[in-house]
Amino acid sequence: MGDEEVQALVIDNGSGNVKAGVAGDDAPRSVFPSIVGRPKNPGIMVGMEEKDAFVGDEAQTKRGILTLKYPIEHGIVTNWDDMEKIWHHTFYNELRAAPEEHPVLLTEAPLNPKGNRERMTQIMFESFNVPAMYVAIQAVLSLYSSGRTTGIVLDSGDGVSHTVPIYEGYALPHAIMRLDLAGRDLTEYLMKILHERGYGFSTSAEKEIVRDIKEKLCYIALNFDEEMKTSEQSSDIEKSYELPDGNIITVGNERFRCPEALFQPSFLGKEAAGIHTTTFNSIKKCDVDIRKDLYGNIVLSGGTTMYEGIGERLTRDITTLAPSTMKIKVVAPPERKYSVWIGGSILSSLSTFQQMWITKEEYDESGPSIVHRKCF
């Protein structure tokens, strides 16, 4: 490491995965599941160092003997003891960096409750002794990573989706929409519809297989009804998938029926509006003078926006809803799975950002509420 500048650490805490790395890098060094596992029957795990908790991939591989918990639900931290375990694992096992030596940039969900932001700040300064930290809204970082400061971000991950209108770098809270429908729901829906085909996936290990099928084979139809008709008349859309045990299964119209739920949440028994309508409603809540800039800069972010065909379909559906004179542009950056992290890496490397950090001195003077004055 160069002496001239201490590198900041960037940690994007998602419901499904933690993305962590060093500011200035173009991709996170570490991506691991946001899970903490504790032994089901403490004291009987022979030959294992008596650990009271396992984090990430290690928890995943030992899941047969553990009770797994996700401390981040729908984008919001709900279990602070487990969250602290995840951060500890991130610093010491994944990044192998001493937190007391680096400024730390954390990310938060849009509309994160005030108490949560204070708790994050407190844990960083008091448990990890960081010299400085900052909390940034995930969608804002995604927009930065696309090279924009104005636009609307549709951020859809594993636990939650949001539409976040941003003007000149600031999120507009009154117009943010949250949709509790994301990757985990789509994986569960795919399990259900594969069941109808006679493939029984039920355990948590099998759920991981279905997630892989989803990521490798699913796509979004431009016109759902036509795609259904086509799939009934030909077997062109059928693909085979080899299971870990060597068996091969065939996946047909499930390939596009699964992610269609993003546009038709009623498939999952949810009353919510689809992502196209949610984006449109979010824009409608904004001042009429900035709507043109939002319609022309609809930026996709998060792993659940990775489906082939999503850009074309969103463009089509939003064009149908919007005023006819409006130019609609959907931007789908290829690296959007990690664009929140990349935006954090960019932001924390800027020379102009260096005065934005909350320092240990400021924290000691003002306490956790300093986060509301410095991070917005």
From Swiss-Prot:
Any one Gene Ontology cellular component term annotated for this protein: nucleus
Region (DNAseI-binding D loop), start-end ranges: 40-61
Enzyme class per UniProt: hydrolase
UniProt KW Calcium keyword: no
InterPro entries: Actin, Actin/actin-like_CS, Actin_CS, ATPase_NBD
Record keywords, A-Z: ATP-binding, Cytoplasm, Cytoskeleton, Hydrolase, Nucleotide-binding, Nucleus
PROSITE patterns, per the entry: ACTINS_1, ACTINS_2, ACTINS_ACT_LIKE
Highest taxon listed in the record's lineage: Eukaryota
Bilayer-crossing regions: none
Miscellaneous section: A potassium ion appears to reside in the active site during hydrolysis and leaves together with the inorganic phosphate Pi. K(+) does not activate Pi release; however, it may be relevant for ATP hydrolysis.
Family: Belongs to the actin family.
Purpose of the protein: Actin is a highly conserved protein that polymerizes to produce filaments that form cross-linked networks in the cytoplasm. Polymerizes into shorter and less stable actin filaments compared to ACT2/actin-2; this is thought to facilitate gliding motility and host cell invasion. Has ATPase activity. ATP hydrolysis leads to the formation of a stable intermediate ADP-inorganic phosphate (Pi) actin, which is followed by the release of Pi. ATP hydrolysis affects filament stability; ADP-bound actin depolymerizes much faster than ATP- or ADP-Pi-bound actin.
Name of the molecule in the record: Actin-1
Name of the coding gene: ACT1
